[in-house]
UniProtKB/Swiss-Prot annotation:
Keyword DNA repair: no
SUPFAM superfamilies: Protein kinase-like (PK-like)
UniProt family annotation: Belongs to the pseudomonas-type ThrB family.
Enzyme Commission number(s) from the entry: 2.7.1.39
Protein name stated in the entry: Homoserine kinase
Coiled-coil ranges from the UniProt annotation: none
Any Pfam family the entry gives: APH
Record keyword Protein biosynthesis present: no
Keywords: Amino-acid biosynthesis, ATP-binding, Kinase, Nucleotide-binding, Threonine biosynthesis, Transferase
Pathway(s) it belongs to: Amino-acid biosynthesis; L-threonine biosynthesis; L-threonine from L-aspartate: step 4/5
Any GO MF annotation of the entry: homoserine kinase activity
GO biological process: threonine biosynthetic process
Gene3D superfamilies (alphabetical): 3.90.1200.10, Phosphorylase Kinase, domain 1 (3.30.200.20)
């Protein structure tokens, strides 16, 4: 999370007039993350997370917010959205789409244990199953068409080796996207910093703003690529096994899904290598921003062989 849009105390008081959350106390920017402006909001009724959306449009928000409400009602550990007095889940702040969600207990981790990987994998499978009857749709905005378009923009700023690697991987994936596999609503960004933990247990998944329809192996691979990734950008096989084991304890994988998983891992590497390259070479302006190392997923991709 980052802060690109600054919000004054007076703006916040006006915003809160649309909610039954008591009086404004304080607002603290959250520097972690890369896409939206995020704050911890404290009022006389409690603590919340405020998100001001820098890319998503107002009409797109109901999908994400209703999804969180749906999952919360199904027992999935998520940050439930807070409704306004008029019943809406989305709002406007500083001329941009915005929302409030519950502030969950727990914290993220940079060094997960096998137990934490196991329980996170299990909760991801529970999420996949719980969203099966969610009625709204969202296509994946950062899949193969986006990779291809972004690649063309990036080629002039990449080294010859990186450009060749990126182009060859995108070309290899274009006819192998896993569209034949079980699919549904996926988180699509379940990195370690998007999961709050309380000891070994999951207290909540957060930041669903890349959620969309996709194949479950792609979602699982994105998560494993981060949760089992070591400091030198290789995979810890014990953490990978624990994560997938937790997932399969809730939703067993077919032989076809298991066979596709290595390809899904490569697709996950491309998606985040590309997005980090864009953030690095074409950064957004903001007062508190956080750009992640784009080489992490290039190096992980190379380590996969």
């Amino acid at each position: 999370m980052s802060v690109y849009t600054s919000v004054s105390d007076d703006e916040m008081r006006g915003f809160l007039s649309g909610y039954d959350l008591g009086e404004f106390v304080s607002l603290q920017g959250i520097a972690q993350g890369i896409t939206n402006s995020n704050y911890f909001l404290t009022t006389t009724s409690g603590r919340y997370v405020l998100t001001v959306f820098e890319v998503l449009k107002q009409e797109e928000l109901p999908f994400f917010l209703e999804l969180n409400r749906h999952l919360s009602m199904k027992g999935v550990a998520v940050a439930a959205p807070v409704a306004r007095k008029d019943g809406r889940l989305d709002s406007v702040l500083a001329g941009k789409p915005a929302c409030l969600v519950a502030c969950l207990k727990g914290s993220d981790t940079a060094l997960p244990t096998a137990e934490q990987c196991f329980h996170t994998g299990a909760m991801l499978a529970k999420m996949h199953l719980a969203a099966a009857d969610f009625p709204l749709e969202m296509e994946n905005p950062r899949y193969n068409a986006w990779w291809t378009e972004a690649c063309a923009r990036l080629l002039p700023v990449l080294s010859q080796d990186d450009a060749a690697l990126l182009c060859s991987e995108i070309d290899a994936l274009k006819d192998n996207l896993g569209n034949h596999l079980p699919s549904g609503i996926i988180h699509a960004d379940l990195f370690k910093d998007n999961v709050l933990l309380d000891g070994g247990q999951v207290s909540g998944f957060i930041d669903f703003y890349y959620a969309c329809r996709g194949n479950f192996m792609y979602d699982l691979a994105i998560a494993v690529n981060d949760w089992a990734r070591t400091a030198d950008n290789k995979l810890d096989e014990a953490l990978k096994k624990a994560f997938i084991g937790g997932y399969e304890g809730v939703r067993p994988l077919s032989a076809e899904e298991k066979a596709y998983f290595p390809t899904a891992q490569r697709a996950g590497c491309i998606r985040f290598w590309v997005s980090r390259l864009l953030d690095f070479h074409f950064p957004q302006a903001g007062e508190m921003t956080f750009i992640k190392d784009p080489n992490a997923f290039r190096n992980l991709l190379l380590s996969l062989g």
